[in-house]
Amino acid sequence: MISVFDIFKIGIGPSSSHTVGPMKAGKQFTDDLIARNLLKDVTRVVVDVYGSLSLTGKGHHTDIAIIMGLAGNLPDTVDIDSIPSFIQDVNTHGRLMLANGQHEVEFPVDQCMNFHADNLSLHENGMRITALAGDKVVYSQTYYSIGGGFIVDEEHFGQQDSAPVEVPYPYSSAADLQKHCQETGLSLSGLMMKNELALHSKEELEQHLANVWEVMRGGIERGISTEGVLPGKLRVPRRAAALRRMLVSQDKTTTDPMAVVDWINMFALAVNEENAAGGRVVTAPTNGACGIIPAVLAYYDKFIREVNANSLARYLLVASAIGSLYKMNASISGAEVGCQGEVGVACSMAAAGLAELLGASPAQVCIAAEIAMEHNLGLTCDPVAGQVQVPCIERNAIAAVKAVNAARMALRRTSEPRVCLDKVIETMYETGKDMNAKYRETSRGGLAMKIVACD
């Protein structure tokens, strides 16, 4: 079973597939060298990056992420503030300390970090890392970053876990989930709670959910407190802090019934601006879509009812259930299915989680998720200058508002829907696979070709 621990992972920006995944791959590679007792023999490491990882890699900091992973770091614990000076040192000296200082190798970046526009055979996000002793290859591994910070090596691509843990209510579709709920009388969050407790202790689960919300709230707080321009040649101004000042100044005087939309926008912009700056965020289910789920929960917290441990668990468990369906039956990778697999999935997850908190039945929760995705079908991934900024940041705000609307529409519906969640997931995947590759995180089409970045 894909767990809430898998869907919501703490990491760093700006991309789960292009930053978090590659960092994990680099760390896994050095762990393998140590396990095989090869580390001491290595004199040089060479990295080859392919497809979407290459085409948008510089803007997504893929090269930096792999280097930091080889150095022994993981996305959830890496010291973000130390990254620039570490990379500068590698660039200056052409040397890299592997595995937390255990062994130093040659690493002239212009020779050892190579970008290739063509795809490897199994996925659009491929990378090959090779360790050499002189001219002799001592170990080489190919990894694929398949979205949401998930990585898999070539040998295990497409394989199920060898020994999956049995859960009380196994599922592979929304229909399965609804059937279990109907037979047991459990809510969808209650059902997912029982499954999670077969994998983790109650204390572990509660701590993880609390940590996730803490990082999400921290992203909002940093985002609404930080001014200036985001890194990169686009020079995109931060907007969340200015929007917060405007909202706070008029909060007690405005009679605008739509002001709540401004707050939702602010929450989402704040998180995504932090992500674009390389800050600490949660894959939800990806970094490119990391502002939607926090924004909708922050909306609930401010305007409906204060979030507590119970409502937090219900929201995140339902959202993760919906996210797992997309992960199992479609994709959450922008390089594979476009932005419908990132922002579209996050919107669907958030709509379902909010519907659960608003008292929806399991069927209504799935309707909310379906509505949210139905109106994200065909969404392209065309990041300008290969950065997770334009159109990504603003798109999260739009999708957060759409998620709230989808949840409300599901709760107010009195007729049977003509489209079910399983069919819209299937449609999303087919649409993504039919989509021209230039609209799937390559920066070779759409807005990416219409906007000239600053020098």
Swiss-Prot record:
Pathway(s): Carbohydrate biosynthesis; gluconeogenesis
Example of a GO biological process term: L-serine catabolic process
One matching Pfam family: SDH_alpha
UniProt enzyme class: lyase
Record bears the keyword Ribosomal protein: no
UniProt xrefs under NCBIfam families: sda_mono
Family: Belongs to the iron-sulfur dependent L-serine dehydratase family.
Protein known as: L-serine dehydratase 2
Lineage: Bacteria, Pseudomonadati, Pseudomonadota, Gammaproteobacteria, Enterobacterales
